[in-house]
Amino acid sequence: MTFDAFTKVVAQADARGEFLSDAQLDALSRLVAEGNKRIDTVNRITGNASSIVANAARALFAEQPSLIAPGGNVYTNRRMAACLRDMEIILRYVTYAVFTGDASILDDRCLNGLRETYLALGVPGASVAEGVRKMKDAAVAIVSDRNGITQGDCSAIISELGSYFDKAAAAVA
């Protein structure tokens, strides 16, 4: 993505026999700054993925104890492992979407057909959606922490991050 933009700007300047203009350099600098914010966001989520998933699951099961009770949809270790795996997969694809700035990878490779799969397996979509919302809350809190990240306004990327979680929750509800 970034190298394509750099290559295009250089090719345009070269075709005109000119140096890169201040406007072109400023635009490329903004692109790099945006890329750094995306990298910081993904690094933060990736570094905390296990706790994001585990804490979201713990909170979900505290609110909906019937899920883990005998006969519940997450009762038995095998079902619990599958639940945690699915939450982790959704989180992973959210990071891919944030990194690329494009929800299509989330839609195409993760969410497409997920609701139907859960319906066929008897998994309550509303519970999955609530688990996704809990992951969203945790991820947004982690990304919003200003310590040790690139300085600048991150409100747009935080909003974008939230929108990917909202899309995932809506897809399974």
Curated annotation (Swiss-Prot):
Residues at which (2R,3E)-phycocyanobilin 1 binds: C83
Entry keyword annotation includes Electron transport: yes
Entry-linked InterPro entries: Globin-like_sf (IPR009050), Phycobilisome_asu/bsu (IPR012128), Phycobilisome_asu/bsu_sf (IPR038719), Phycocyanin_b (IPR006247)
Chief location: membrane
Biological processes, Gene Ontology terms: photosynthesis
Keywords: Antenna complex, Bile pigment, Chromophore, Electron transport, Membrane, Methylation, Photosynthesis, Phycobilisome, Thylakoid, Transport
SUPFAM superfamilies in the cross-refs: Globin-like (SSF46458)
Post-translational modification: Contains two covalently linked bilin chromophores.
Entry membrane topology: Peripheral membrane protein
Highest rank taxon of the organism: Bacteria
Residue positions binding (2R,3E)-phycocyanobilin 2: C154
UniProt keyword Membrane, yes or no: yes
Cellular component GO terms, alphabetical: phycobilisome; plasma membrane-derived thylakoid membrane
List of residues that carry N4-methylasparagine: N73
Compartments where located: Cellular thylakoid membrane
Cystine pairings recorded for this chain: none
Alphabetical list of PANTHER family matching this protein: C-PHYCOCYANIN BETA SUBUNIT, PHYCOBILISOME 32.1 KDA LINKER POLYPEPTIDE, PHYCOCYANIN-ASSOCIATED, ROD 2-RELATED
Assembly and interaction partners: Heterodimer of an alpha and a beta subunit, which further assembles into trimers and the trimers into hexamers.
Family, as annotated: Belongs to the phycobiliprotein family.
NCBIfam families reported for this sequence: phycocy_beta
Name of the protein in question: C-phycocyanin-2 beta subunit
Natural source organism: Synechococcus sp. (strain ATCC 27144 / PCC 6301 / SAUG 1402/1) (Anacystis nidulans)
Organism phylogeny: Bacteria, Bacillati, Cyanobacteriota, Cyanophyceae, Synechococcales
Gene that encodes it: cpcB2
